[in-house]
Curated annotation (Swiss-Prot):
Entry binding sites for Mg(2+): D77, D79, D81
Cofactors, names only: Mg(2+); Zn(2+)
Keyword entries, A-Z: Amino-acid biosynthesis, Cytoplasm, Histidine biosynthesis, Hydrolase, Magnesium, Metal-binding, Zinc
Gene that this sequence comes from: hisI
One GO BP annotation of this record: L-histidine biosynthetic process
Organism in which the protein naturally occurs: Cereibacter sphaeroides (strain ATCC 17029 / ATH 2.4.9) (Rhodobacter sphaeroides)
Protein name, per record: Phosphoribosyl-AMP cyclohydrolase
């Protein structure tokens, strides 16, 4: 069956959450938003493209930083309202220069930084 981005369930703003996960390690790297066109561009090019809510523009991950995300597999959840992007990540995924945006853990009621910036 051919994939059609219009078959996904987008929110009132026309967006769907997309979680990026390292295809080899399973590490969750980041979450961002996509609209139907960003999904289509990602599938067509293999370069992950998000929708920047703050800039109201397409954001090709790594276009300016060089920290490219290559799509290995796109998975759709059971309600078709969330995407899992299995990717190959070049360099850090987070704008803080960390491998993952999920670098703060809650441990014993305290926030702890668990990932240092990559050098």
């Amino acid at each position: 069956m051919a994939f059609d981005p219009a078959s996904l369930t987008f929110d009132a703003n026309g967006l769907i959450p997309a979680v990026a996960q390292d295809h080899a390690t399973g590490e969750v790297l980041m979450m961002a938003w996509m609209n139907a066109e960003a999904v289509a561009r990602t599938v067509e090019t293999g370069r992950v493209t998000y929708w920047s809510r703050s800039r109201q523009a397409f954001w090709v991950k790594g276009e300016t930083s060089g920290h490219v995300q290559r799509l290995i597999e796109l998975r759709i959840d059971c309600d078709r309202d969330c995407l899992l992007l299995l990717i190959e990540q070049e360099g850090p995924a987070c704008h803080t220069n960390r491998r993952s945006c999920f670098y703060t853990a809650l441990r014993e009621g305290e926030e702890r930084i668990i990932l240092d910036p990559m050098v």
